[in-house]
Amino acid sequence: MSRPIIVFDLDGTLIDTAPDLLDSLNHSLAASELTAVDEAGFRRFVGHGGRVMIERAHAAQQRSLDVAEHDRLLKLFLDHYTDNIPGKSRPYPGVIEAIARFEKAGYLLAICTNKYEANSLALIEALGLTRHFAAIAGQDTFAFRKPDPRHLTETIRLAGGDAHRALMVGDSQTDIDTAKAAGIPVVAVDFGYTDRHVREFEPSAVISHFDALTVELAERLIRAAGH
């Protein structure tokens, strides 16, 4: 019988990668001779990958990009980010304890992220967390990505988990919409990378610290989903 599973988003959910993403974004903006972005600006641009982040940051300074320049800046961004992994990125408070809690309760753990798979694997490895995850699926692991629900359901399949006893944990509308489309309950963290409060997207529950992500909460939400 397949085991229950918790599937986490990565950036802004499990790991606070904002300082490194911001550094890499500003590295690419400097190549366009644009003003560096602060943390508040970063939150307006993040959430859909590096390409969209770069486009939004340029648009905010009334600068358009052709395809070739966009590709060049994305490569600068990705190379800078990859070369500095793990940089300043660290797990959010309570993450390590939550991992131990769910492992003790017999849950599988997985990651479903729109970060590139190689960078996701490198980050988790650099932080010493790889052994805890049965699957780590990035935006290029499959032929589809969040908010396509197959990204989540295929991550669960890859991990060997039970989709009828699954819970998603994320920080964005994309995560919430993905889980809903898959028929899987979703807990939203309210400390991630979005400029709107996650309650607006109607997740199954909202937490402000990983201490609140208890086995009891997970089991209650999974039961309520009616699988």
UniProtKB/Swiss-Prot annotation:
It catalyses: 2-phosphoglycolate + H2O = glycolate + phosphate. Mg(2+) binds at residues 9, 11, 171. It comes from the Bacteria. The active site is at 9 (nucleophile). Keywords: Carbohydrate metabolism, Hydrolase, Magnesium, Metal-binding. Pfam families: HAD_2. GO terms for biological process: carbohydrate metabolic process; DNA repair; glycolate biosynthetic process. GO terms for cellular component: cytosol. Its EC number is 3.1.3.18. GO terms for molecular function: metal ion binding; phosphoglycolate phosphatase activity. Its cofactor is Mg(2+). Specifically catalyzes the dephosphorylation of 2-phosphoglycolate. Is involved in the dissimilation of the intracellular 2-phosphoglycolate formed during the DNA repair of 3'-phosphoglycolate ends, a major class of DNA lesions induced by oxidative stress. Belongs to the HAD-like hydrolase superfamily. CbbY/CbbZ/Gph/YieH family. This is Phosphoglycolate phosphatase. It comes from Mesorhizobium japonicum (strain LMG 29417 / CECT 9101 / MAFF 303099). The gene is gph.
